[in-house]
Every structure is written in C-alpha cells, then in structure tokens.
C-alpha cells in the first residue's frame, strides 16, 4: 500500500460485566425489543441471589443484591449476555463510524469505495485507519490518535474500559527507496506511541509496532504483514 495505514487492537476489559444497564436497555430497544421484556431481563440481573457451592457443600446463606443496590453485570454464562452485548456494541461501532473514522478501500474491479471502521469479535476490536494522498505523517498519526480517543470515550460512556495489557497498535508509513515502496522504521516516525484514556481518568500509552511484529490475538500469535511467523510455534 502506498498510503499510510494503521490497525489498533483495543481489548475491552470485562466487557459483559461492565455494561451499564441503561445503555443495555437502549441497545435492546434499538433492535425492537419491547420495554416490558427488557425490564424483566434487567430486573432479574439486578436482584439475583446466589448460593455458593464448594467441596464443603452449599452455603446456607445466599449473597446477592437488592433493588436499592442492584448488580450491573450482564453475567458471564447468561444466554442473554451475548445478544445484549451485540446490541450495545452495534451502537458503539455505529457511533464511532458516524464520527468519520475508518479506512477506505477501493475495489479494483467495480471501483466501489468501501469504508471499514472496525471489526469486532466480542470484546476484541480492530480499528482501521487509512491516510490520504498528500497527508503528512504527523497529520495521519494525529488522526489515528483522535480515533483512539473517540473510541475510548465511547467505551467509557457505556460503562466499559480498554485493557492496555491486551491492546496494541500497528502502523505502516510508506517511503520510496529506489522506486520501491517500503515501510518506514518505527524509530523514524514523529511519535512512537499512542495514548488511551481510561475510565478512572488516567492516560495510558501503547507502543507503535510494525506490521511484521507478531502479537497474540484470540489465542494465536500472528503478524499483520501476511507472512507466516514462527512466533506462534515458539510460543
């Protein structure tokens, strides 16, 4: 590719356990779920009581919550949790895309332009960015940083947070060398890291990596340059 491009892998921290119920209700309503059904679902979540079972037997006293101090989780293992999070994450992606973020791809056959903002698999999200002809490296990296900020704010507004330990950034900025397009070394970029706002108000950073660097994703280590790295076998 002869233009700048980047992929930001942002992992959501405890995604099912962090969704605010008000946002969950809005997400389900946007998919046509009746308000009465939503009230039943969420009230069950909020007031459930649990009996712990261990090797010593079942606890005599349950623990749980009340209407005054409700739980706010979607509950890991609940059959409704994946569908509810689908509703919420769809709103999140649509909101993010409405802000203008995403990479544009041109079909060489139909000449149709496709804009792809992100690809999401439950709590693992890859965000895509592409530059424009004539765009400076500084402007492109600023655009990526703004996209990260907007996504982080979107996540926080739903009750969630981005987990830094499982997130990373990959950037490719082209340069011409004897008529060949090659990627600049990361050390020659104007910045070498991006910042990610956190739910508690802190600002954390992630290093910028090249697409040839293999990173763990969905339990597999792979690079983003199309090569077949040995990292996963060694790992």
Segments and roles (model prediction):
Residues 48, 52, 56, 161-213:
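Short, conserved micro-motifs composed of acidic
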Residues 1, 83-134:
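Active-site palm subdomain of RNA-directed nucleic acid polymerases
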Residues 13-17, 22-28, 66-106, 151, ...:
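Conserved pre-motif C helix in the palm subdomain of viral-like polymerases
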Residues 1, 43-67:
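Reverse-transcriptase-like RNA-dependent polymerase core
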């Amino acid at each position: 590719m002869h233009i700048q491009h980047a992929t930001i892998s942002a992992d959501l921290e405890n995604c099912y356990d962090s969704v605010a119920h008000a946002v969950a209700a809005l997400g389900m309503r946007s998919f046509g779920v009746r308000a009465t059904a939503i009230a039943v679902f969420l009230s069950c979540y909020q007031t459930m009581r649990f009996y712990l079972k261990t090797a010593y037997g079942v606890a005599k006293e349950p623990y749980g919550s009340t209407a005054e101090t409700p739980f706010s989780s979607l509950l890991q293992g609940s059959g409704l949790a994946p569908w509810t999070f689908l509703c919420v994450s769809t709103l999140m992606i649509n909101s993010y895309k409405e802000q203008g973020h995403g990479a544009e791809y041109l079909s060489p056959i139909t000449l149709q332009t496709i804009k792809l903002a992100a690809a999401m698999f439950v709590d693992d999200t890859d965000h895509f960015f592409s530059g424009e002809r004539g765009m400076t490296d500084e402007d492109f990296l600023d655009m990526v940083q703004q996209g990260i900020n907007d996504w982080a704010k979107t996540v926080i507004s739903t009750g969630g947070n981005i987990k830094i330990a499982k997130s990373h950034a990959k950037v490719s900025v082209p340069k011409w060398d004897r008529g060949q397009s090659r990627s600049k070394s990361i050390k020659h970029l104007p910045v070498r890291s991006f910042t990610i706002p956190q739910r508690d108000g802190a600002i954390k950073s992630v290093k910028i990596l090249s697409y040839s660097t293999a990173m763990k994703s969905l339990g597999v280590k792979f690079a983003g340059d199309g090569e077949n790295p040995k990292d996963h076998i060694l790992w």
